[in-house]
């Protein structure tokens, strides 16, 4: 675990919460862009029937992948790949991984990079910019 100046773990918590929110948004946006709003609504219902509310999509992404794979077969990998690539782009990083690379590892690496480098997603009005000034 990274220790921030003055032991400020609230910065880490804020970054992790924002990361998870951003990942969930990337997932929903990817499904909507690729499959349309009607299918997106069905995917949300499918996840909720399996005990995964929208707020838990990122924290339970492994389960989301299993559910999608069960429902869509191997084509679910396209949704997962596009979601992870979109997440990297949201943090202004080039997705330098292939379709068959371990996407779970790529998400974990990005999460750690976000925390260690205090990265902010492009479309997040929820992060107070003062954390970037105070902790660098």
Language model features with spans:
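Long, compositionally biased intrinsically disordered regulatory segments in eukaryotic proteins
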Residues: 1-136
